[in-house]
Protein backbone atom coordinates (compact mmCIF):
# COMPACT_ATOMS: atom_id res chain seq x y z
CA UNK A 1 0.00 0.00 0.00
CA UNK A 2 2.95 2.30 0.57
CA UNK A 3 3.97 1.95 -3.08
CA UNK A 4 0.49 2.95 -4.27
CA UNK A 5 0.47 5.94 -1.92
CA UNK A 6 3.93 7.01 -3.10
CA UNK A 7 2.94 6.69 -6.76
CA UNK A 8 -0.24 8.69 -6.16
CA UNK A 9 1.74 11.41 -4.38
CA UNK A 10 4.28 11.60 -7.21
CA UNK A 11 1.46 11.83 -9.77
CA UNK A 12 -0.20 14.62 -7.80
CA UNK A 13 3.10 16.51 -7.55
CA UNK A 14 3.69 16.14 -11.31
CA UNK A 15 0.19 17.41 -12.14
CA UNK A 16 0.56 20.32 -9.73
CA UNK A 17 3.90 21.28 -11.26
CA UNK A 18 2.47 21.00 -14.78
CA UNK A 19 -0.48 23.26 -13.95
CA UNK A 20 1.80 25.74 -12.17
CA UNK A 21 3.94 26.08 -15.30
CA UNK A 22 0.93 26.09 -17.62
CA UNK A 23 -0.83 28.87 -15.68
CA UNK A 24 2.34 30.88 -15.06
CA UNK A 25 3.25 31.02 -18.75
CA UNK A 26 0.71 31.84 -21.46
CA UNK A 27 -0.38 28.72 -23.37
CA UNK A 28 1.89 28.13 -26.37
CA UNK A 29 -0.14 25.30 -27.84
CA UNK A 30 -1.10 25.52 -31.51
CA UNK A 31 -4.79 24.83 -31.81
Curated annotation (Swiss-Prot):
InterPro entries: PSII_PsbT (IPR001743), PSII_PsbT_sf (IPR037268). Its main location: membrane. GO terms for biological process: photosynthesis. It is found in: Cellular thylakoid membrane. Pfam families: PsbT (PF01405). It is a single-pass membrane protein. Keywords: Membrane, Photosynthesis, Photosystem II, Thylakoid, Transmembrane, Transmembrane helix. The keyword Transmembrane helix applies. The chain crosses the membrane at residues 3-23. One of its GO terms (cellular component) is photosystem II reaction center. Belongs to the PsbT family. PSII is composed of 1 copy each of membrane proteins PsbA, PsbB, PsbC, PsbD, PsbE, PsbF, PsbH, PsbI, PsbJ, PsbK, PsbL, PsbM, PsbT, PsbX, PsbY, Psb30/Ycf12, peripheral proteins PsbO, CyanoQ (PsbQ), PsbU, PsbV and a large number of cofactors. It forms dimeric complexes. Found at the monomer-monomer interface of the photosystem II (PS II) dimer, plays a role in assembly and dimerization of PSII. PSII is a light-driven water plastoquinone oxidoreductase, using light energy to abstract electrons from H(2)O, generating a proton gradient subsequently used for ATP formation. This is Photosystem II reaction center protein T. It comes from Prochlorococcus marinus (strain MIT 9211).
